[in-house]
């Protein structure tokens, strides 16, 4: 009996370490200069087989071996960070209105809807629940969440997940540095740059001069066969 318990414990430790190693490996691939690996990122997680931005959708991605999930944050009336893309809960839940008009407990009474607009048994998850699920298993890309940067970072730090999360903003380096300078060096930050807008190159130059991000998210309305700069 003791031998069985010891084997079970060892297997649990090995599984835990391998999960942590997986998240670290994904991060290293992302940051390694010249790495030709292709990373798979799931937009709002596995929204085809589960409600978007739900725990089940993220769990599916982990089981499929996806490298990174992209999520969006909103804040409840009582200050909890939750996963929600839209400004209202109308499209993705059985409720109506803005998430900031409800407490977390009130939002839990609604059910998430799937991609075909049908009610499911799933509820809106908190950001902390998501990071606890993702810890050591998958990278997390917080797309809409800059408004809650400090609160999100506090949750990441609390759960030991600062190294596997990407935060983003469509703002110049000077502003991001002024607002969150101490945090920028402790996590991965990805600038979002709208190439069609005036001053886009200046924004990129500002980041390159001071922090050299591992990547940029570039937004554009049209492309050309080659760069015409």
Stretches found by the model and what they are:
Residues 19-229:
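Phosphate-group recognition and catalysis centered on beta-loop-alpha active-site segments
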Residues 1-23:
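Bacterial Sec-dependent N-terminal signal peptides
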């Amino acid at each position: 009996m003791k031998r069985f318990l010891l084997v079970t414990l060892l297997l649990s430790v090995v599984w835990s370490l391998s999960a942590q190693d997986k998240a670290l490996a994904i991060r290293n691939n992302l940051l390694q200069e010249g790495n030709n690996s292709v990373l798979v990122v799931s937009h709002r997680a596995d929204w085809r087989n589960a409600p978007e931005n739900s725990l089940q959708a993220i769990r599916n991605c982990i089981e499929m071996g996806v490298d990174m999930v992209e999520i969006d944050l909103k804040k409840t009336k009582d200050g909890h960070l939750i996963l929600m893309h839209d400004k209202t809960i109308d499209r993705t839940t059985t409720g109506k209105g803005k998430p900031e008009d409800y407490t977390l407990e009130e939002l839990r009474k609604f059910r998430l809807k799937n991609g075909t607009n049908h009610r499911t048994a799933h509820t809106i998850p908190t950001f902390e629940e998501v990071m606890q699920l993702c810890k050591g298993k998958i990278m997390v890309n917080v797309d809409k969440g800059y408004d809650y940067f400090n609160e999100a970072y506090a949750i990441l730090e609390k759960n030991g997940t600062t190294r596997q999360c990407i935060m983003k903003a469509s703002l110049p380096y000077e502003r991001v540095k002024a607002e969150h300078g101490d945090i920028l060096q402790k996590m991965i930050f990805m600038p979002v740059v709208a190439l069609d807008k005036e001053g886009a190159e200046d924004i990129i130059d500002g980041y390159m001069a001071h922090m050299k991000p591992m990547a940029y998210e570039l937004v554009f309305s049209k492309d050309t066969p080659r760069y015409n700069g």
